[in-house]
Curated annotation (Swiss-Prot):
InterPro entries per the UniProt record, alphabetical: Aminotransferase_I/II_large, AON_synthase_class-II, AONS_Archaea/Proteobacteria, AONS_Proteobacteria, PyrdxlP-dep_Trfase, PyrdxlP-dep_Trfase_major, PyrdxlP-dep_Trfase_small
Protein name: 8-amino-7-oxononanoate synthase
Gene encoding the protein: bioF
Keyword Transferase among record annotations: yes
Named cofactor requirement(s): pyridoxal 5'-phosphate
Length: 385
């Protein structure tokens, strides 16, 4: 490595450590369950995105095993070569039937799906309008795309209206259905009405809404009776697996098959995974009890902790516990860990300055007893018990 690059790396890491923002992966056993193990100790896990409790569901495990017996391991090629199997086709058809679209383009991650559309669709002279709290994949793609990008204050419809009112070029408005760090929902009905008024297109990343909200878990868009032009759903949260799909009309799907580089030049999802995902879709659609259980746990969370200054009310399983100062958030997370609760301190740049927090996430597999323990520990470590 050249000296210039080495110095750049060393300096960046030093600065990150000095700011108290250094992050690292820890080896976790059973991180997809409500009780995880780390270095021989067990902790209640309130940090995973396994909202419906599918990630370790034995029915889904068996579906993956059946997929392996039918299709083997990897897909062996990109979707446009030999990597698109009946398992992929069936998954796409299931998603379209469930969510009401004509086309579902599959990707290895939500990050790829988000960036694929923006890079393929936008040209110089277009306007990209994004919520300021959109996911890093969306913001990065916007910064690198040839389009002009404007960002509006979080969920501020007046600000969005003003931006669209001043534009006469092709415009794409992008938001999240549920925001991953705040757990709040986008005002999709009003936003959709604005895009209709100004002849703009709407893209919604519903990674944290699909499976959890709406009839049959169709997500935040269905809950708001809105059908965006482009809908991204990801498989690493409520589905209990990984990957993503971009749902569109047929013409847009054909366009993505030709021009979405993340799709064209990536090896297709393992067919066994696609097979299991089709089973997950069926579980999500038919097992309403999982969403009912989540709603019960959310009610308990509010009953136990709703009076605390750090409590933030949400209608989703994402429950931010606002602290503010970065080192204080790290300290509270560590004290919770000492009491057997695994929570993660979320710090800048993931969230804005002075909004460091614990990101608490609920799963349908959590018990009422575990919720009570969580509340007791949070109150104890914050000195209010």
């Amino acid at each position: 490595m050249t000296q210039a690059f080495n110095e750049r790396i060393v300096q960046a890491l030093k600065q990150r450590r000095e700011q108290g923002l250094n992050r690292q992966s820890e080896v976790i056993f059973s991180g997809n369950q409500t009780v995880l193990e780390h270095q021989g100790k067990r902790y209640l896990n309130f940090s995973a995105n396994d909202y419906l409790g599918l990630a370790n569901d034995q029915s889904l495990v068996r579906a993956w095993q059946q997929g392996l017996s039918l299709y083997g391991c990897g897909s062996g090629a990109s979707p446009l070569v030999t990597g698109y199997t009946p398992a992929h086709s069936n998954l796409a058809a299931s998603l379209c039937d469930w969510l009401g679209y004509e086309s579902a383009t599959l990707f290895g991650s939500g990050f790829s799906a988000n960036q694929a559309l923006l890079f393929a669709l936008l040209e110089k002279g277009d306007l990209l309008v994004q919520d300021k709290l959109n996911h890093a994949s969306l913001i990065e793609a916007g910064l690198l795309s040839p389009a002009s990008m404007k960002r509006f204050k979080h969920n501020d419809l007046q600000a969005l209206d003003a931006i669209l009112n001043r534009s006469d070029c092709p415009s794409l408005v992008v938001t999240e259905g549920v925001f991953s760090m705040d757990g709040d929902c986008s005002p999709l009905a009003e936003m959709h009405a604005l895009t209709q008024r100004y002849s703009a297109s709407l893209m919604v990343d519903d990674a944290h809404g699909v499976g959890v909200l709406g009839e049959e878990g169709r997500g935040s868009c269905a809950l708001a009776s809105v059908k965006p032009d482009f809908l991204v759903v990801t498989f690493g949260k409520a589905f209990g697996l990984s990957g993503a799909a971009l749902l569109t009309d047929k013409s847009s799907g054909d366009f993505l098959a030709q021009f979405a580089r993340h799709h064209v030049y990536s090896t297709a999802l393992p067919p066994a995974q696609a097979f299991a995902l089709t089973h997950a879709v069926e579980m999500i659609r038919t097992q309403q009890w999982r969403r009912d259980k989540l709603n019960e746990l959310q009610t308990l969370f509010a009953e136990y902790l709703g009076e605390h200054d750090s409590f933030v009310a949400t209608q989703t399983p994402i429950k931010p516990w606002l602290i503010g100062e970065t080192q204080q958030a790290v300290m509270v997370a560590q004290r919770c860990r000492e009491q057997g609760i695994w929570l993660t301190a979320i710090r800048p740049p993931t969230v804005p300055q002075n909004t460091a927090r614990l990101r608490i996430t609920l799963s349908a597999n959590h018990t009422k007893e575990q919720m009570h323990t969580l509340a007791q520990v949070l109150l104890t470590v914050t000195g209010e018990h």
